[in-house]
Amino acid sequence: MGLLKTEAIVLKNNLIGETDKIATLFTKSYGKLQAVAKGARRSKSRFVNAIRPFIVANYVIFEGKNYYYIDQWELIEAHRNIEKDLVKFSVASYIAETINKILEENQKSERLYLFLKHSLKAVDELQIDPLIFISSYNLKLVSLLGYMPQLDNCVVCGKRENLKYFSNSCGGAVCINCKNKCFDAKPLHEVTLKAIKYFLKGDYDKLQNIKVSGVIKEEVDKIITAYMKEHLEIEFKSKDFIDNLQNM
């Protein structure tokens, strides 16, 4: 394949051998791939900062016998605030984990790449309640993947009135008359539905000063987490750590 030149985001890195590290990169041009940074564990190596989690950089990569290897790199976004803040780092870890688990090796998606880049930049630069941010991110992610929940009309009959329930299996809001047609329909507070709509449609910067009660935040989080599990069939370990932070 020769040399690959691409912008990429580091999803995670691991140790390999005595002096090297291997990174999971989401590249803009070639999708997800694993690339080794030779000598990255040495303090004076030119690759010591090349695969820090969540950075955005331009890479030149070549294909070896067993792995891809990083030949050159140039930093684009360092995301220093994420590095310094435990909550921001935890949110970024969750975001990176979702993308890593969703993508297959070498699977390309420029729309998903740009969404990830935009989301990490928002985590780094904005001050948003972590539970609100993750709920907004999750809603935007499932919608981007083709699983946008129906929120404006009953998912069964299409009526706009009395949307008092939410069903994961049916795919969204359910009216009073149709609640028995979705076996998992659960009561949905009117304010919760409004919050879900706002988190889905509003850009991240609109979430900085929003006032939402703890009860509504938790209800939205539970609904969206269950919805993701239903449609993506994936659970994310780093979400547990964020939940624990919220309870500290």
From Swiss-Prot:
Transmembrane portions of the chain: none
Job description of the protein: Involved in DNA repair and RecF pathway recombination.
InterPro entries: ARFGAP/RecO, DNA_rep/recomb_RecO_N, NA-bd_OB-fold, RecO, RecO_C
UniProt lineage: Bacteria, Bacillati, Bacillota, Clostridia, Thermoanaerobacterales
Gene, per the UniProt record: recO
Identification of the protein by name: DNA repair protein RecO
Top-rank taxon, per record: Bacteria
Keyword Metal-binding: no
Pfam families per UniProt: RecO_C, RecO_N
Organism: Thermoanaerobacter pseudethanolicus (strain ATCC 33223 / 39E) (Clostridium thermohydrosulfuricum)
GO cellular component: bacterial nucleoid
